[in-house]
Design a protein with these regions (language model features):
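Metal-ion/cofactor- or nucleotide/acyl-coenzyme-handling active-site neighborhoods
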Residues: 1-231
Length: 231
């Protein structure tokens, strides 16, 4: 296991055909032949390919989403249930972290009395024995670029992932499975619970993120959006 820097990440993706998967239900509007043809497949947080769901019902989405995962991108909080064994089994060779291993700023809200929402160091203390492959952790300065692009709101993991990949200048970046939680679900079929965000002055603003993501296709000719994002 090695911790790698931003230049390593840029070299890793540059010139490659890359597919990045969010976990909105529309990620299933794909087929495995198309997805498996990409050089690198990036999946976010609690992605689903094949297994047993939270309701103890087995699922198999391989015919829709492919069966390979080359890169896992996550904020790696306690809600991320993927184990190192899960990721290794799926073929992950690079982990990319959304958050810096640093304290950002004071952030006191009712549901977050310990201010953990803007101090990411506890995430990494809990994960100190987790890392098993090349791992990228952004600097505070890089993270704040995305925070500032949303006028002082916390970026979602998907938004940060897409912007990180855009900076790497791949040959193609196919973006699928992102809907800004419009359908009310994530992890393909689980309800999105965002009650705390309504009371958080720096909480997510997915509508603004979706507007930005859709606009990327007009600035970068290597961006390819899925059917839902293109509408």
């Amino acid at each position: 296991m090695n911790f790698v820097n931003k230049q390593f990440i840029k070299d890793y993706f540059r010139g490659k055909r890359v597919a990045v998967f969010g976990s909105a239900p529309n990620c299933l509007d794909n087929n495995d032949a198309h997805i498996d043809g990409f050089d690198l497949i990036v999946r976010v947080n609690n992605y689903k390919i094949k297994g047993v769901g939270f309701d103890n019902i087995a699922y198999d989405y391989t015919s829709k989403v492919g069966n390979r995962t080359d890169v896992h991108y996550s904020f790696y909080g306690s809600s991320i249930l993927k184990s190192a064994k899960d990721l290794w089994r799926d073929g992950v060779k690079l982990c990319m972290c959304k958050c810096p291993n640093e304290f950002l700023f004071e952030h006191e809200v009712q549901w977050d009395p310990k201010n953990v929402g803007s101090d990411f160091r506890p995430l990494y203390r809990r994960r100190q024995d987790f890392w098993f492959c090349d791992t990228y952790i952004p600097t505070k300065e890089d993270f704040m670029v995305y925070f500032d692009s949303l006028r002082g709101h916390m970026p979602t993991t998907g938004y940060s992932c897409i912007l990180d990949l855009v900076q790497c200048e791949p040959k193609e970046l196919y973006i699928t499975g992102f809907d800004g939680f419009k359908c009310g679900k994530h992890n393909v079929d689980e309800m999105w619970r965002d009650k705390k965000e309504r009371y958080d002055p720096i909480g997510h603003i997915p509508e603004a993120e979706m507007h930005y993501i859709k606009a990327l296709q007009y600035y970068y000719d290597f961006i390819k959006l899925d059917r839902s994002l293109s509408e």
